[in-house]
């Protein structure tokens, strides 16, 4: 679900599939992303969902050239929770109210314990099958905003 994979007959599209991710490299640009979501009258609790690489970049990104304060402090950006996950595509993030995503499951979860396929390796194979899909509740473009994080350009002393 957190990938950029296109959907198919046997798996749903990831939430990063088919979206154009705007590149950000400064705290000011990140504030503009938050403003776009706020302008959509999103009422729920907003969160950031990002890759571990995006989190690492934001942990090193200063809020401005006049401060040593960093964009990501602990596990939040100005009090907004940040969730980092290795399933999110490299340097990408999503920001918004994730309660606007509904997941559905159909039928039972099938669990198969196969002691034969890997018997020569003294192992068992476990197969789990489930029918799952997800959709946004609101079609508004800015309920959840997508982007990519890049390291800020190095500043030249005296400029």
Kindly give the residue locations of the regions a language model identified:
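Long, contiguous amphipathic alpha-helices that act as assembly "spine/axial" helices in icosahedral shell
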Residues: 1-13, 38-49, 53, 82, ...
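Alpha-helical scaffold segments that mediate packing/assembly in large oligomeric complexes
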Residues: 1-36, 145-159
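Charged, gly/pro-rich, cysteine-poor intrinsically disordered low-complexity regions
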Residues: 14, 18-99, 105
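Sequence/fold signature of self-assembling virion shell proteins
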Residues: 62-159
């Amino acid at each position: 679900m957190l990938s950029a994979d296109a959907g198919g007959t046997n798996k749903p599209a990831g939430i990063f599939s088919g979206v154009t991710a705007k590149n950000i490299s400064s705290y000011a640009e990140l504030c503009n992303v938050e403003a776009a979501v706020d302008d959509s009258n999103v009422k729920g609790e907003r969160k950031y969902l990002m890759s571990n690489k995006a989190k690492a970049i934001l942990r090193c990104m200063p809020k401005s050239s006049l401060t040593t304060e960093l964009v990501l402090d602990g596990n939040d950006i100005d009090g907004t929770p940040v969730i980092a996950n290795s399933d999110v595509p490299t340097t990408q993030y999503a920001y918004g109210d994730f309660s606007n995503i509904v997941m559905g499951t159909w039928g039972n979860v099938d669990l198969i314990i196969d002691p034969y396929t890997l018997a020569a390796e003294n192992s068992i194979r476990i197969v789990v099958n489930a029918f799952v899909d997800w959709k946004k509740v609101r079609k508004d473009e800015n309920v959840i905003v997508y982007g990519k994080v890049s390291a800020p350009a190095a500043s030249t002393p005296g400029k």
